Amino acid sequence: MVLFRGLKPAFKKVNKIKTKLDLHSVRTADDLLNTKDNLKFVKAVKLLIKPSTRFNRFYLSTIRKFAEFVQNITENQCGFFSQEIGFLERGLERSSRTLALCLKYFFPEEVNFANISSKDALWIYATFTAALFLDIGKIAVKYSITLFHKK
């Protein structure tokens, strides 16, 4: 079994704050994406991206790799409306909304992205990945994650 630990923010190490050891198993992309909210966001993306071969080849593979990278790490939000939400759910929500906005404002006569040119499809994919990966640097900056085998 492969585990990862160190989901406490890195500043706790610097300030020598004692925290309990927290171990989490590394999960597969299918396992991570198989939640009600995540399935809803993936379905929203799939409905917009046509043909389905384009979705399966580009979008789904990117979503799966993103899910395996961020796992179930939570993103802490500070402020008046503070909440704890996972990087995966936040990225999927942001990217699905971005695709819907692109369709509405750049292609108002279209129902989905089936009839757009290859050049436009590339721009839409770039916009999708930018929205999905927006906060991915926070994982490297805020967290210290160690991967090890339990034996």
What kind of region is each of these model predictions?
Residues 18-151:
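Acidic/His-rich, divalent-metal-binding segments that scaffold phosphate/diphosphate chemistry
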